[in-house]
Amino acid sequence: MATDYHHGVRVIEINEGSRPIRTVSTAVLGLIATADDADPAAFPLDTPVLVTNVIAAMGKAGKTGTLYRSLSAIAAQTKPLTVVVRVAEGETEAETTTNAVGGVSPDGKYLGAQALLAAQSKLGVKPRILGAPGIDTQAVTNAMASVAQRLRAFVYASAYGCATVTAATAYRGQFGQREVMVIWPDFVNWDTAIDEEASISAVAYAMGLRAKIDEETGWHKTLSNVVVNGPTGLTQDVFFDLQDPATDAGVLNAKEVTTLINMGGYRFWGSRTCEAPGGFFYFENYTRTAQVLADTIAEAHFAFVDLPLHPSLVRDLLESINAKFRDLKRQGYIIDGHAWYDEQYNDKSGLKDGKLAIDYDYTPVPPLENLRFQQRITDRYLADFAARIAA
């Protein structure tokens, strides 16, 4: 011990001070898909599989079901880490929905969408961008939303089975989770399995594009108004006018449905989540900013748990968090943020019991959703007409 008698020199390492905080990885996909002819060794049923090369994985994904075309749509945008859970395609839509919703087997194995919860322990990655392209019925989307809340992830879901704007907006009303974005309609692209154009879930493209934006721009940028690679058309007509809200796109966006437009390339149009009215996380990036900050700050301070609770430890915690906020502000990920120690939440009985509360706030970066130019006609530029001629 340091207090024992010793006639000589001791060196004691002091590992204190603030520590750098690394932002959690966000461009990790969690894909639920069907493919009865997929390689069962590469994609076993109800088992999370880590795909590090989506293009190479397509060779073992089969051609039936949704897996192959979903991977193709993702690969057209970028090549992210993707956790794939293959579920059995039932003889009916209801059976497929049951398989995708999943649950827990008698021996404790997580099934369907629930298998994404096992990705962290089995694969060492946490899916942050979730979707079940082509099989995301209302029940599946609700199951995915529940998983997303536990993973601090975000779900992209189609307005399943909706053929009209009215139906799509009504469908959106079935959800109230900030972790969900509803998309309508779907894309059309070339299907190499049948040598002709066919519809494909826009959700697969949204997942790939979300990962691409995270990698190239950041999680503070919404999905909206970025060119999508691959689509050749839309499954439904969508009337869009940049300057007129009285359009199909305007109605959909007003009801928090992200739609698809073609303006210099196919794009998603809309940044709203399904959060219930009155909430704070109505923009996609507001939700994702909250998720990223929560996990980043919590995981960065795992090493602080069970250390001696000295005032110096609190100072180190605060400096670590505030240094991270300064860095995120400098890079444009947040407007600003600040952490502090509040005595009212840290009375002596709580401190004595080993409890510490650190407060912090932050301001996410709002997307420019509604740009207004105020155009005026004037005759003041005629006042010096003669001088302008002389010039």
Question: Which residues make up each language-model segment?
Answer:
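Surface-exposed assembly/interface segments
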Residues: 1-391
